[in-house]
UniProtKB/Swiss-Prot annotation:
Pathway stated in the Swiss-Prot or TrEMBL entry: Purine metabolism; IMP biosynthesis via de novo pathway; IMP from 5-formamido-1-(5-phospho-D-ribosyl)imidazole-4-carboxamide: step 1/1
Thermal dependence: Fully active at 80 degrees Celsius. Gradually loses some activity from 90 to 100 degrees Celsius.
Gene Ontology MF terms: IMP cyclohydrolase activity
Activity versus pH, per record: Optimum pH is 6-8.5.
Family according to the record: Belongs to the archaeal IMP cyclohydrolase family.
NCBIfam families, per the entry: PRK04151.1, purO_arch
HAMAP family: IMP_cyclohydrol
Any one biological process term the GO annotation gives: 'de novo' IMP biosynthetic process
Job of this protein: Catalyzes the cyclization of 5-formylamidoimidazole-4-carboxamide ribonucleotide to IMP.
InterPro entries: IMP_cyclohydrolase, IMP_cyclohydrolase-like, IMP_cyclohydrolase-like_sf
Catalytic activity, reaction form: IMP + H2O = 5-formamido-1-(5-phospho-D-ribosyl)imidazole-4-carboxamide
Official protein name in the record: IMP cyclohydrolase
Keyword vocabulary terms for this entry: Hydrolase, Purine biosynthesis
Organism: Methanocaldococcus jannaschii (strain ATCC 43067 / DSM 2661 / JAL-1 / JCM 10045 / NBRC 100440) (Methanococcus jannaschii)
Length: 202
């Protein structure tokens, strides 16, 4: 199944909260997830000239602010992070409503999530819908939210999670066979001694 770019929020079997983001693409496969610093992961093209072909292929996909993780499929990552003082729900709702879906040929939804060790909110804005919802994370499970054929937040979109470290989860989600055309993956895990980030590419 092809669901395009997607995020996963959940907990490891040992109960560590995490957020993951995977680029799945048929149109722009030559991209990588690059750790820019201890708090930021960016999606960038391997050929920087491609940045000028499409405004939606280069962006920060994970941003860590103190003990909170923001994950999304576009430039709204940074704006959500800036609005965290609104609270998780309102930061998502405000930024998604203001920025709206991507104005490309596919009317691609913007998807996002915010989580810390205590709670998680997921949200999206599509051309015909907008939603923000608090979800209860379960050990060993992850909610996924994709831009194509999977842009909804419900119990039917839960997958098993394998791995305890950011590296293990990134490898698992990048190679998750049900979702086609993997390109790159980034993961942030909330551990007892801080938030750990890892990236993986094809």
């Amino acid at each position: 199944m092809y669901i395009g770019r997607f995020l996963v929020v959940g907990k490891t079997k040992e109960g560590k909260p995490f957020a993951a983001y995977r680029v799945s693409s048929r149109s722009f496969p030559n991209r990588e997830a690059k750790k820019m610093d201890d708090n930021t992961v960016a999606i960038i093209p391997k050929d920087l000239n491609e940045m000028f072909k499409n405004p939606y292929i280069t962006y920060n996909c994970i941003k860590v602010i103190d003990k909170t993780i923001v994950v999304s499929n576009g430039t709204h990552t940074d704006f959500i992070a800036e609005k965290l003082h609104f609270g998780k729900r309102d930061a998502l709702a405000y930024v998604l409503a203001v920025m709206d879906y991507e104005k490309d040929d596919y009317k691609t939804p913007r998807i996002a999530a915010i989580l810390d060790e205590n709670e998680c909110y997921m949200g999206y804005v599509a051309h015909d819908d907008i939603r923000v919802k608090k979800v209860e994370l379960k050990d060993g499970k992850g909610y996924y939210l994709g831009v194509y054929n999977a842009c909804k937040i419900d119990e039917n979109q839960i997958i098993d999670i394998k791995g305890e470290t950011a590296e293990e989860i990134a490898d698992y989600i990048l190679n998750y066979e049900e979702f086609e055309h993997p390109v790159a993956c980034a993961v942030a895990v909330i551990d007892k001694d801080g938030i750990k980030i890892a990236t993986k590419g094809k």
